[in-house]
């Protein structure tokens, strides 16, 4: 988006944070207004994450105004809220490329800018990373400051608490900013708390506090009494007792949209010693009425007209895998009250909105707590309930020990509905579901399935639900197949593949939705085409037939080649001393950047033409 200097006179002066610091403080409210307007107009023309960034405009301005970035370290959690940060740090004129192939990264990314001190995308990592940076600065004798910005959702995750517990122990000089935008911690915002925050963060109070500690250090009983009195006084006026118990000096809550208040408070806190936590209250979608009214709907948006009060409706199309999963859950719940559906804060994305409303007693959103989600399911299974864990592929990585130790080791019947498997598209490296087959395949007792289309997904979910062992059904973002979704549910034979087309010489073994892309190669080469369905157990009887009747075996998967489904076939063929040539097609040994699913598949040679070309090159 080209900057109209007449519309954005202040923003036009700022190409990096040093320029922002040249502005007089009384200009910051007007500057924040311009930044918010530019963000809205930019994202509405390009698509992307909107509501979170609208809510952090004043915070972003205040942080870059007070802190000497990039020398001072600023760490954003997750990164949805970092669009204003990107605009202020030299990337304003590239915002129209965000989340597009070869464009700006959707999240803070170290390779993109020196201002992005830590690459993010998953939640609750900021405090740990910032603590590491803070300790490093102290060891190097450098005076740089470290700030972690984390939301009220992300701070509930275990990793954030682990980091705060450690921070309180080592007492490193760093600041945590708790961006509370959902009224989930406190509603105590107003003139009194703003005034109290100024007092508690100011030098007068801090000097008295630290001086008293030194004076009373030789009189332990009196020191302990004074400390308790301070905690009780603060506890009557502020909701930060929990953080104080962890060893953090708590300030707030304050209005996160009062940029001058933020600047004053941050200036006070910048020079405080030890761990600090500033609690700010913000509104997701701030400044744009439709986003304020529907922050979830405006979290991630397509291109839209900001002058209208609604987002464009999606064009009718084939049902997505997430929709099919959600409908399947509702169908099963009508038949079985033992069904327990669990999600770690992915209700909308996993297609569970309808289920959560129709079956609230069987629905458990455990927040950003993947480890807990999996072990909760294990506990359900121990008592004869039927747990289904709906989780994104890239987030299941965070619960790997629980998958092994708490589920598979005990051979508990837990069904994992793994969404966003394979290439997900515009969210890039942190969200690609490239590794689940590789890290699950080595776990004993697991059954792993990959549907070729949405109808088959429904049958696989039903099959997994009936099994008496841990089962994973992994499916991609979006849809596959054009047929109407069947109302019936078919029990599939475990470990049995489906031969789609009988050919000669070349056999293409497809695991998942790339089956459709393999049709062209199968037709042109008169190859046998197999929908393998099961990654574990493999259909070894069929494999025996194929290696005795074909010269070339090709495996195809939307997963890392290393350790994936193709590797499983390789391992089996090696035990049989098979005299066939083997070609493995899948995701290469590198982190896949952002772009549409089709763009990235084509780039990796997993589109129709790419598969045909790769097989031709191999057999020739």
Swiss-Prot record:
Keywords: Isoprene biosynthesis, Magnesium, Metal-binding, Thiamine biosynthesis, Thiamine pyrophosphate, Transferase. Signal peptide: none annotated. Homodimer. It catalyses: D-glyceraldehyde 3-phosphate + pyruvate + H(+) = 1-deoxy-D-xylulose 5-phosphate + CO2. It comes from Pseudoalteromonas translucida (strain TAC 125). Mg(2+) binds at residues 152, 181. GO terms for cellular component: cytosol. GO terms for molecular function: 1-deoxy-D-xylulose-5-phosphate synthase activity; magnesium ion binding; thiamine pyrophosphate binding. Its EC number is 2.2.1.7. Catalyzes the acyloin condensation reaction between C atoms 2 and 3 of pyruvate and glyceraldehyde 3-phosphate to yield 1-deoxy-D-xylulose-5-phosphate (DXP). This is 1-deoxy-D-xylulose-5-phosphate synthase. Binds 1 Mg(2+) ion per subunit. It is an enzyme of class 2 (transferase).
């Amino acid at each position: 988006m080209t900057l109209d200097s007449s519309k954005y006179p202040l923003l036009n002066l700022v190409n990096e944070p040093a320029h922002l610091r040249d502005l007089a403080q009384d200009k910051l409210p007007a500057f924040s207004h311009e930044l918010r307007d530019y963000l809205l107009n930019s994202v509405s023309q390009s698509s992307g994450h909107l509501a979170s960034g609208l809510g952090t405009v004043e915070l972003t301005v205040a942080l870059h105004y007070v802190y000497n970035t990039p020398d001072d370290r600023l760490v954003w959690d997750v990164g949805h809220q970092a669009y204003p940060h990107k605009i202020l740090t030299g990337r304003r004129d590239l915002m129209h490329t965000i989340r597009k192939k070869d464009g700006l990264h959707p999240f803070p990314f170290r390779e993109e800018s020196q201002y992005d001190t830590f690459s993010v995308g998953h939640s609750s990592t900021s405090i740990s990373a910032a603590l590491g940076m803070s300790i490093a600065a102290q060891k190097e004798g450098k005076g740089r400051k470290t700030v972690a910005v984390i939301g009220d959702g992300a701070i509930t995750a275990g990793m954030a608490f682990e980091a705060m517990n450690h921070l309180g122990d080592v007492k490193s000089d760093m600041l945590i900013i708790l961006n509370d935008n959902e009224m989930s911690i406190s509603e105590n915002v107003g003139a009194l708390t703003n005034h109290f925050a100024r007092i508690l963060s100011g030098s007068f109070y801090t000097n008295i506090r630290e001086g008293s500690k030194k004076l009373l250090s030789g009189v332990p009983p009196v020191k302990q009494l004074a400390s308790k009195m301070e905690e009780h006084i603060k506890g009557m006026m502020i909701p930060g007792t929990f953080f104080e118990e962890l060893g953090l000096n708590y300030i707030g809550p304050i209005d996160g949209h009062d940029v001058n208040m933020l600047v004053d408070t941050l200036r006070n806190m910048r020079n405080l010693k030890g761990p600090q936590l500033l609690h700010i209250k913000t509104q997701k979608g701030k400044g744009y009425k439709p986003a304020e009214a529907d922050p979830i709907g405006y979290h991630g948006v397509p291109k839209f007209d900001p002058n209208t009060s609604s987002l464009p409706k999606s064009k009718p199309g084939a049902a997505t895998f997430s929709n099919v999963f959600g409908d399947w859950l509702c169908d099963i719940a009508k038949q079985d009250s033992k069904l327990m559906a669990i999600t770690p804060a992915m209700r909308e994305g996993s297609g569970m909105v309808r289920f959560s409303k129709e079956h609230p007693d069987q629905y458990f959103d455990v927040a950003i707590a993947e480890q807990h989600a999996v072990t909760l399911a294990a506990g359900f299974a121990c008592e004869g309930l039927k747990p289904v864990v709906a989780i994104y592929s890239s987030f299941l990585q965070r619960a790997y020990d629980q998958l092994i130790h708490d589920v598979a080791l005990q051979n508990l019947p837990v069904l994992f509905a793994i969404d966003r498997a394979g290439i997900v598209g515009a969210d890039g490296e942190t969200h690609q579901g490239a590794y689940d087959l590789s890290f699950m395949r080595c776990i004993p007792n697991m059954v792993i399935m990959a549907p070729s289309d949405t109808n088959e997904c429904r049958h696989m979910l039903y099959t997994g639900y009936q099994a008496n062992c841990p089962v994973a059904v992994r499916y991609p973002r979006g849809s596959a197949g054009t047929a109407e979704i069947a109302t019936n549910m078919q029990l599939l034979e475990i470990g049995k593949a489906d031969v789609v087309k009988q050919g000669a010489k070349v056999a293409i073994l497809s695991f998942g939705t790339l089956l459709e892309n393999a049709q062209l190669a199968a037709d042109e080469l008169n190859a046998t085409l197999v929908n393998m369905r099961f990654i574990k157990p493999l259909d070894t009887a069929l494999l025996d037939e194929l290696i005795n009747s074909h010269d070339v075996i090709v495996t195809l998967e939307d997963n890392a080649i290393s350790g994936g489904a193709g590797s499983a076939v390789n391992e089996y063929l090696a035990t049989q001393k098979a005299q066939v040539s083997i070609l493995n097609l899948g995701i290469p040994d590198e982190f896949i950047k952002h772009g549409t699913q089709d763009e990235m598949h084509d780039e990796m040679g997993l589109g129709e033409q790419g598969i045909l070309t790769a097989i031709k090159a191999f057999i020739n």
